[in-house]
Amino acid sequence: MSLIKFLLTIVFLPLFPLLAETTNVIVTDGDTIRIGEERIRFSGIDAPEINQTCTYQELEFACGEFSKNLLVEKIQNQQVNCVREGKDQYGRTLAECFVNQESLSSFLVREGYAFAYRKYSKKFVLDEEYAQNKSKGMWATEFQYPWDYRRNN
């Protein structure tokens, strides 16, 4: 490893400490989990609110609840590793979390049950474009973006 890479690693590693490695995870909604007392909001994505609904072929369904359940299924008592990225305005820890080295944020966006939160990050835009092009998840429905839903409700 070059001296520069080594020094950068030493300098920046403390900024992104491993937040958690645990199987004791409570899923709050499609983009928020709880590990112990720590509320963790997935950074860079926005999932539908828990009470939010979508319409598919004139049938209304709970897409917010579906997003949450998809995350529950994905985690299924597996070890979750989270990397801290900061705090949000509500005091929640912002982090990217992984199961088997797969980003849960990327998974949710690629499945169409979360959106790239472009206001804060462009990291998951390609995942969103993939889901949209394949009409996955909410992209096959009539929906409001979560940020519009929150503003209107």
Residue ranges and their predicted role:
Residues 2-8, 14-153:
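Small beta-barrel nucleic-acid-binding modules, primarily SNase/OB-fold domains
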